[in-house]
Design a protein with these regions (language model features):
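A domain-level signal for the structural core that forms small-molecule/cofactor-binding pockets
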Residues: 1-187
Length: 187
């Protein structure tokens, strides 16, 4: 996906423009380090939601039909408008279909992979729901609280703001007590 040589040259150009001493020792290897950083941060750009669903399809048939809530999944992403950092707290709820549950470690992995793209917070929730739907789930709720550097650290500079988005599928769209049970579980 990434043309490593082009990226290294681009990083050198940026450093030459923003630093008065771009040749100093501390910056000598910075373009290569930036390449590794970008490859890690944007790894999710290499995969479609179908790919992600296939990667993390580890389900167990246990006969459960009870609500499952996982709170506090911590991820980072970058907004597509400024490439600014977004720090996200993601909460997922679902009702198992046909008694199948997804391995718990797969939820953070899915969240992490869809976050490793240039994104907007709303789409991250939609992408997580889409991946879970591809795994056969119907009743899904994704609640994301995000701190956006494009608001917190630049421009309007409002460091205390947190943006909440909800993505609802299935019963969560119309079952208010069920939706409230999830919202009440989020601290």
């Amino acid at each position: 996906m990434f043309d490593e040589e082009k990226l290294i040259e681009a990083f050198k150009t940026i450093l030459n423009e923003i630093d008065p001493e771009p040749q100093r020792a501390g910056l000598k290897e910075t373009p290569k380090r930036m390449l590794g950083y970008f490859k890690e941060l944007f790894e999710g750009a290499n995969y479609s939601n179908d790919d992600i669903a296939e990667m993390f399809d580890k389900q167990f048939e246990i006969g459960s039909k009870d609500l499952v809530i996982m709170n506090g999944i911590h991820c980072f992403s970058h907004c597509e408008h400024h490439c600014a950092l977004m720090e996200l707290n993601i909460n997922i709820a679902y009702i198992p279909k046909d008694g199948k549950v997804l391995g718990l470690s797969k939820f953070p992995r899915i969240c992490d992979m869809v976050s490793k793209r240039l994104q907007v917070q709303e789409r991250i929730g939609m992408d997580i729901c889409e991946v879970l739907q591809k795994l056969g789930m119907e009743d899904i709720m994704v609640v994301i609280d995000g701190r956006h550097a494009c608001v917190n650290a630049r421009g309007i500079k409002q460091p205390q703001t947190v943006t909440r988005t909800n993505c609802l599928r299935g019963r969560f769209e119309y079952d208010l007590p069920l939706k409230n049970e999830v919202l009440n579980s989020i601290k």
